[in-house]
Amino acid sequence: MLSKYRGSMLSHVKLASNHERPRLAIIAHDGKKADLVAFATFNRSRLQEYDIIATGATGDLLRDKVGLDVERVTSGPHGGDVQIASRVVEGDVDAVLFMVDPLDKHPHDPDIQTLLRICNVCNIPLATNIATADVLISSPLLLEFRAAAS
């Protein structure tokens, strides 16, 4: 039964970007940055398999604390979330890892909601916490999509 499901998924979903490696956008609210650094440090070798795009301070942390190569856009409150949403629409992002702090207010909440909506509209995998981020970067489907894109 699982093989039927996997075959069905592969026929309907593919990597959005035409890059050799999947492109992963990473964003973290301030209250979740420490969790992201711990997650990224633990999963460094796996994350190195992706081309990473990140918002300002998140990108700095991933580069400086974890040692990952990162393409940075501006910070989230200054339009970075919208820049990433635009890249999703353009087909330049294959998955989004957005460590959301649900207990804090965010003045740029409309931008955040735009990104979340665009991921759903474009059928882009979206992880909003550590548990789903782990599932996302471990997905055998992403590995199969990667092989199919080659």
Q: What are the roles of these predicted feature ranges?
A:
Residues L24, S45-I52, C122-I124:
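Short active-site oxyanion
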Residues F39-S45, I112-T114:
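Short, solvent-exposed amphipathic alpha-helical segments in soluble enzyme
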Residues D51-I52, L68-G79, A148:
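Short hydrophobic/aromatic-enriched beta-strand-loop microsegments
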Residues I53-T55, R72-T74, F98, L126-T132:
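General beta-strand structural signal in soluble alpha/beta enzymes
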Residues A57-G59, H106, I112-L126, I130, ...:
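Non-catalytic terminal and connector segments of soluble metabolic enzymes
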Residues H78-R117:
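Mid-chain, well-packed structural core segment of small domains
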Residues A131-S150:
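Short, glycine-/small-residue-rich phosphate/pyrophosphate-handling segment
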